[in-house]
Amino acid sequence: MADNRLSIKEKIGYGMGDAGCNIIIGAIMLFVNYFYTDIFGLAPALVGVLLLSVRVIDAVTDPIMGALADRTRSKYGRFRPWLLWIAFPYALFSVLMFTTPEWTYNSKVIYAFVTYFLLSVTYTAINIPYCSLGTVMTADPKERVACQSYRFVMVGIATLLLSLTLLPMADWFGGADKAKGYQMAMTVLAFIGMCMFLFCFATVRERIHPAVQTNDELKKDLKDVWKNDQWVRILLLTLCNVCPGFIRMAATMYYVTWVMGQSTHFATLFISLGVVGMMIGSMLAKVLTDRWCKLQVFFWTNIVLAIFSCAFYFFNPHATTLIMVLYFLLNILHQIPSPLHWSLMSDVDDYGEWKTGKRITGISFSGNLFFLKVGLAVAGAMVGFLLSWYGYDAGAKAQSASALNGIVLLFSVIPGVGYLITAGVVRLLKVDRTLMRQIQSDLEKRRSNYSELNEYQELKTSEHVRKA
C-alpha cells in the first residue's frame, strides 16, 4: 500500500476540484429557490417543476458521460482531462443561470429552463470525471477517507467564501438592482471556481488502472454494473443522503428572513457559521473512522441527526444566540457522513471489480451523480411545492402563520425524517472494514498477475518479431 499514499499537496489539489464545483453548485443549493422566486420572479411551484424536469434529461446524459470518461485515453489519463476541457463552460453557464433578462414572463421561464439545463449538462461533464478521480488516485481505504476529508474541508472553505461574499457582493454590485448584483457576484465566484478546477488538474495523478480495460458497448456496461448489488444500494443511499441537507439549505434563507425576521447581513453570518461547522464535521470523519467502521459511524450519526433536527421545530426562533449555537452543532453532525459517503462509493467500485472482474468507474459514478442530482431536484421541488402549499407569497410584506409553519417544517422536521430514512438505508450496505481488507488484497494480487501476464505476452511478441 506504500505506493497508494497521497501527499498533502495532492489531497489539497483534489479538494480544490470539488471546491471549484461547489462554489458554483453551492450557490444553487443555498440560493436557487430564493433567487428564482424573489429575484427572477418565478412562481414557487414552477421552480419545483423546473428542478425536477431537467433530471429526466440527466437520466440520458449521465450514463453517456460515464461511458465517455471510462473510454477516454489521453496522456493525462481517463478522468483528469475533463477538468481542463469543461472548467470554462461550467463557469460560463453558471453566470448565465444567475442572469435575469428583462423579458416577458413566458420568455423568462424558457430562459430559466434552458440555462439551468446547460449548467446541469456541464456539471455532469465535469463532476462525473472528478468524482471518479477519487477512486483511481489510491486503493487504500484509509487514504480514501483522508482524501475525502481534505476534499470536504476545501468544499467548506469554498462554501464559506460563497456564503460570506455572494450576498454582500450582490448588494455592492447591484445596489437596488438585485438581479444585476447576483449576476456580477456569480461572475466573480465562477472565475474563482474555474481556477480551482485548473489547480486540481495540475496537481492530481491517476494511479489505479483496471486489470482489464473496457471496450464493450454502453449497453453492456450498463448491464454489467447492475450485477454489483452494493452499487444498487449505494444509489439509494445517495438519493436519501442528499435530501435532508439540501431541504434545510434551501429553506435557510426563508427561515432567517421570515421566521427569525433577520436581514441579509445576518443571513450571511448565519450561513457562514453553519459552513464552519461543516468543515469541522469533515475533519472529524477521519478521526472517527480511524477507530470505528465507517458504516457504523454513518448509521449512528444519522440517528442523532434525526432527533436533533426534529427538536429544532420546538426551539424559539427569536432566541437568536441559541438558534445559532444549535445550527452550528447541527452542521458539524450533518457533515460527518459526507466524506464517508464518497469513500464508500470508491469501496463499492472496488467491490464491483472484485465480484465481476470488470471495473467501470465512470458508469458507476455517473449513476451516483444522477441519483445525487435527483435527490437535489426532489428536495428543491419539495421546498417549492410545500411553500406554495402553505401559501408562501414572495411579494408579501409579511407571511401568513401557515406559510411560516411550512418554512419551519422544511427547516427541521422534514430533514429529520430524511436522516432517519438514510440511517435505515446504511444498514443495507455490507462493504465494512473486514470485507474491504479482503477485497483490496485480492484485487492487488489480480492486478499484479495481469500485469505479469501482459509483460510475458509482450516479451513473446517481441521475440517472435525478431525471429521473423
Per-segment meaning from a language model:
Residues A2-K467:
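Membrane-embedded alpha-helical bundles of multi-pass transporters/translocases
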